[in-house]
C-alpha cells in the first residue's frame, strides 16, 4: 500500500463504492430536488430528495412492495412493470408534496437505455413530474406492460402463479393497477 506525504486516502463511501462525489456535487449544485431510483434484489425504490446542510431530506418515497400492499399488484417487485408503476406512484406523491420538477439521480448504476431505472423515470414523467430526459432511453411500451413476459411460458414465472396471476395475464393486470394508481392520485 502506498505511504508517505503524497498519498491521499479517498473518502470512505467512495472506497466502499457507494457514492460518486463528483456526480453528487453536480446534482446538488443544480438546487433541484433529486429523483433517486435504486433497485435491490427484490424491489425498486424511488424517492424525491432535497439536499440540506444537515443531510438529505425525503419529500416523497415509494417502493414496489407498496404496490402489492396498497394496490394489489401480484407481479414481481423487481421487473420493468413494477419499476414503471413505482415511478408513476412517486411522481404523483411528489406532486402532492409540492414538487413539480426534479433531476434523476441514478447513483452508481450503469447508464443503460431501456433499463428499470429508466422505466421508473418514464412512470414519473407520465405522472406529470418534469424531469429532463431523452425519450430514447425509455423502454418500449410493450416491455413496460410486461408483454415480453406474457409471450414467454417458461417455468421461471411460477412465482406469478403462486401469487394468483398467470404470466399471460400480466399486461391486463398492469393496466388494472395503473388505473388504480391514476384514479387515486391522478384525479386530484
From Swiss-Prot:
Function: This is one of the proteins that bind and probably mediate the attachment of the 5S RNA into the large ribosomal subunit, where it forms part of the central protuberance.
Protein's GO biological process: ribosomal large subunit assembly; translation
Similarity comment text for this entry: Belongs to the universal ribosomal protein uL18 family.
Protein source organism: Methanocella arvoryzae (strain DSM 22066 / NBRC 105507 / MRE50)
Alphabetic keyword roster: Ribonucleoprotein, Ribosomal protein, RNA-binding, rRNA-binding
Protein name per Swiss-Prot or TrEMBL: Large ribosomal subunit protein uL18
GO MF term set: 5S rRNA binding; structural constituent of ribosome
SUPFAM superfamilies: Translational machinery components (SSF53137)
NCBIfam families the record matches: PRK08569.1
HAMAP family referenced in this protein's UniProt entry, alphabetically: Ribosomal_uL18_A
Cellular component GO terms, alphabetical: cytosolic large ribosomal subunit
Assembly and oligomerization: Part of the 50S ribosomal subunit. Contacts the 5S and 23S rRNAs.
Domain of life: Archaea
